Design a protein with these regions (language model features):
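Extreme N-terminal starter segment of soluble prokaryotic enzymes
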Residues: 3-5
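Conserved active-site alpha-helix within GNAT-family acetyltransferase domains
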Residues: 102, 114, 126-144
Length: 161
C-alpha cells in the first residue's frame, strides 16, 4: 500500500483533474471534458445525479488518480432507491497496483455511506476485463448485465456498511 493521500478535489486541483479525466476518457474531446467537469460540479442534476463528488489520490503534491462518485436514484435494478455510483475511477499506469484505486473506492464508499446510501454501484464494459477484475478485488460483486446507451455493461455493487 502506498502512503498516498486521498482527499476531495480543491479548486487548485482542477487542471490536474482534467488531465487525469482526459487520460481515462482518451477518445473524448478535451474541451468537452472540461465543460462537462464544470457542469458536474455546479449542476450535477443536468447529468441525472443528485450530488457529485470528486476525490483525488496524491503522491506528494501531485495528483495521480481520481474517483468521481455521485448519488443517483435512477440506477437500473434499484427501484428508485438512492445509491452511490462510480462515474469514473482512474490511476496513472505507473502508480497502479499500489492500492491507490482501492483506496479511492474505499473513500467513495465512505462518502456514499455518510450520505445514507446503502450501496456503491459501478458499471464496466465487457471489453475491459482489467476493470472488472479490479472492481471485484475491491469488494464489488456482479449483479447483472444490461444494455445502456447502446452498449452492454456489467453492473456491480458494494455495500457501504
Amino acid at each position: 500500500m502506498t502512503p498516498a493521500t486521498i482527499r476531495p478535489l480543491q479548486d487548485t486541483d482542477r487542471a490536474a483533474w482534467l488531465g487525469l479525466r482526459q487520460a481515462l476518457w482518451m477518445g473524448s474531446d478535451a474541451t468537452t471534458l472540461a465543460a462537462e467537469a464544470g457542469t458536474l460540479l455546479s449542476e450535477p442534476q443536468r447529468f441525472g445525479a443528485l450530488f457529485y463528488h470528486v476525490l483525488l489520490a496524491l503522491d506528494g503534491e501531485r495528483a495521480v488518480g481520481f474517483v468521481e462518485v455521485s448519488l443517483r436514484d435512477d440506477v437500473d435494478g434499484f427501484g428508485g432507491r438512492v445509491v452511490g455510483y462510480v462515474e469514473g475511477v482512474y490511476v496513472e499506469p505507473r502508480h497502479q497496483r499500489r492500492g491507490l484505486g482501492r483506496a479511492l473506492l474505499d473513500a467513495a464508499t465512505q462518502w456514499t455511506r455518510e450520505r445514507g446510501a446503502p450501496e456503491l454501484t459501478s458499471d464496466v464494459l465487457p471489453d475491459n476485463p482489467e476493470s472488472l477484475a479490479f472492481h471485484e478485488r475491491s469488494g464489488f460483486r456482479r449483479i447483472e448485465h444490461r444494455a445502456s446507451r447502446g452498449k452492454q455493461q456489467t453492473l456491480l455493487t458494494r455495500p457501504t456498511s
